[in-house]
Swiss-Prot record:
The lineage of its organism: Eukaryota, Metazoa, Chordata, Craniata, Vertebrata. It is linked to Defects in GALNT11 may be a cause of heterotaxy, a congenital heart disease resulting from abnormalities in left-right (LR) body patterning. It is an enzyme of class 2 (transferase). Its EC number is 2.4.1.41. Highly expressed in kidney. Expressed at intermediate level in brain, heart and skeletal muscle. Weakly expressed other tissues. In kidney, it is strongly expressed in tubules but not expressed in glomeruli. This is Polypeptide N-acetylgalactosaminyltransferase 11. It comes from Homo sapiens. Residues 319-381 are annotated as: Catalytic subdomain B. Residues 150-261 are annotated as: Catalytic subdomain A. The gene is GALNT11. Pfam families: Glycos_transf_2, Ricin_B_lectin. The chain crosses the membrane at residues 7-29.
Length: 608
């Protein structure tokens, strides 16, 4: 009797275990499908404790198979194979097809993103708030060690009508890649944004998932980046201020090199190397080490690093003296920021403030360096998606204030280019002139002689020509394939409608001519399609309904980045669509972009 009881007891245990196994399997495998279509972070752990880890797209279900059963109906067997999340890390692996359009809603979101933000919001939302970025530092930087007693930083991020996902990815990149003891706080300054998700939804997210170290400051009217940063600095209590734009992603060990330089000399202001995040694909890529300069139109520009700056004992890790800063990303001692006069509060919104603070740093006893071992990615947009509240030309207004306070007699160099501005009003500058006297600042001639001797001067102030460092341009990308581009359904070739050298010309399908070199395409390692070694196949990022055209190769990917899929599709990365024959049986041979569906009209083959 006892053995029977034991046997049935064991059967019961086995049945119960099997039941729980099935229930847990169902729960963990299908819970994602039941999530609503909004941001639903799943908690994980990081250097600052629990944090939201996983992200579900807010407006579109995106390319995941489990969320898009219609993919099978569309016969797309290889949809975003590389878009997977590591179950341990919760980080999305980047795919060139992350921006693929699957339906009209995706198309609307993509087009709206370019209109509102001037970058691909569809990809931004699909990426979520966490992702790995490539470590773009020089190998020597990875061998450096930093003192344990570095000062803690307040990170100030001003934003106006920023994409929600881009803003939170900026914030989470700082949290994910900064030691907790070095991150005193993050201050978000909302410059009176119009978008609803940047109001209550942002507050709710911060309170729920980022309590403690995040402060959200709300401006009651549009102040602009300049005064917005001053407001953020006024609320900061960390020893060091770090200013970041609202569409950045910091890299590995980004903060320690900046803090170490400031710890060594509190009058040193430092900038990271700014890596490139493509506005079209959000791909993160390394930038060369360059330094800031300017021209007499008072516009910032990038300069090659002079040989005199490259021969230091520290080698590739040595700080690089920079005459100016780009302005979006820099760090300085908080007390020194206030001692030096913060920003010119008479400047409006944006423009010129980076040159003004650069001149003031150098002329008033400070130093400005770029730190090669610190890297931060930044979305470089082709246009500003918003203007000034009243439509005023803030760049001109701010440049005039800068010229009259800091350039001394050299302001005539500016007015020689803009004589129309000599009598234009620029407001009261007496406070800034008095600040210059109080700080005992040097002359602008001293700045040109000692900080930026490479700057050329015309007229009576002309000085001997400085050595010019010639940039011979990038090396041509490696050719991967060369041949005719066949449309498999029609057995025709993609060619120029007119001359292959005609910039802006359309491409069409015509009968293949094996003796015609003008039908030869090159596909290179930059994923460019180059016809007859002359022009690249290009798409408009903002008007995806436009047909592809031949344009000068710009080497920046995006609108000229094409990939060949497993189903012989030809996918355009920035548009998120595939190339198709409009009327395969017709005579015109027109081609256009369309949602990728695996149909025969979208099948291509590049010979070679």
């Amino acid at each position: 009797m006892g053995s029977v009881t034991v046997r049935y007891f064991c059967y019961g245990c086995l049945f119960t275990s099997a039941t729980w196994t099935v229930l847990l399997f169902v729960y963990f495998n299908f819970s994602e499908v039941t999530q609503p279509l909004k941001n639903v972070p799943v908690k994980g752990s990081g250097p600052h404790g629990p944090s939201p880890k996983k992200f579900y797209p807010r407006f579109t279900r995106g390319p995941s198979r489990v969320l898009e059963p219609q993919f099978k109906a569309n016969k797309i067997d290889d949809v975003i194979d590389s878009r997977v999340e590591d179950p341990e890390e919760g980080h999305l692996k980047f795919s060139s097809e992350l921006g693929m359009i699957f339906n009209e809603r995706d198309q609307e979101l993509r087009d709206l993103g370019y209109q509102k933000h001037a970058f691909n919001m569809l990809i931004s939302d699909r990426l979520g708030y966490h992702r790995d970025v490539p470590d773009t530092r020089n190998a020597a930087c990875k061998e450096k060690f930093y003192p344990p007693d570095l000062p803690a930083a307040s990170v100030v991020i001003c934003f106006y009508n920023e994409a929600f996902s881009a803003l939170l990815r900026t914030v989470h990149s700082v949290i994910d890649r900064t030691p907790a003891h070095l991150l005193h706080e993050i201050i978000l300054v909302d410059d009176d944004s119009d978008f609803d998700d940047l109001k209550g939804e942002l507050d709710e997210y911060v309170q729920k998932y980022l309590p403690g170290k995040i402060k959200v400051i709300r401006n009651t009217k549009r102040e602009g980046l300049i005064r917005g940063r001053m407001i953020g600095a006024a609320h900061a209590t960390g020893e060091v201020l770090v200013f970041l734009d609202s569409h950045c992603e910091v890299n590995v060990m980004w903060l320690q090199p900046l803090l170490a330089a400031i710890r060594e000399d509190r009058h040193t202001v430092v900038c990271p190397v700014i890596d490139i995040i493509s506005a079209d694909t959000l791909a993160y890529s390394s930038s060369p080490v360059v330094r800031g300069g300017f021209n007499w139109g008072l516009h910032f520009k990038w300069d090659l690093v002079p040989l005199s700056e490259l021969g230091r004992a520290e080698g590739a890790t040595a700080p690089i003296k920079s005459p100016t800063m780009a302005g979006g990303l820099f760090a300085m001692n908080r007390q020194y920021f206030h001692e030096l006069g913060q920003y010119d509060s008479g400047m409006d919104i944006w423009g010129g403030e980076n040159l003004e603070i650069s001149f003031r740093i150098w002329m008033c006893g400070g130093k400005l360096f770029i730190i090669p071992c610190s890297r931060v990615g930044h979305i470089f947009r082709k246009r500003r998606p918003y203007g000034s509240p009243e439509g005023q030309d803030t760049m001109t207004h701010n440049s005039l204030r800068l010229a009259h306070v800091w350039l001394d007699e050299y302001k005539e160099q500016y007015f020689s280019l803009r004589p129309d501005l000599k009598t234009k009003s620029y407001g009261n500058i007496s406070e800034r002139v008095e600040l210059r006297k109080k700080l005992g600042c040097k002359s602008f001639k001293w700045y040109l002689d000692n900080v930026y001797p490479e700057m050329q001067i015309s007229g009576s102030h002309a000085k001997p020509q400085q050595p010019i460092f010639v940039n011979r341009g990038p090396k041509r990308p490696k050719v991967l394939q060369r041949g005719r581009l066949y449309h498999l359904q029609t057995n025709k070739c993609l060619v120029a409608q007119g001359r292959p050298s005609q910039k802006g010309g359309l491409v069409v399908l015509k009968a293949c001519d094996y003796s015609d070199p003008n039908q030869i395409w090159i596909y290179n390692e930059e994923h460019e399609l180059v016809l007859n070694s002359l022009l690249c196949l290009d798409m408009s990022e903002t008007r995806s309904s436009d047909p592809p055209r031949l344009m000068k190769c710009h080497g920046s990917g995006g609108s000229q980045q094409w990939t060949f899929g497993k189903n012989n599709r030809l996918y355009q990365v920035s548009v998120g669509q595939c190339l198709r024959a409009v009327d395969p049986l017709g005579q015109k041979g027109s081609v256009a972009m369309a949602i990728c569906d695996g149909s025969s009209s979208q099948q291509w083959h590049l010979e070679g």
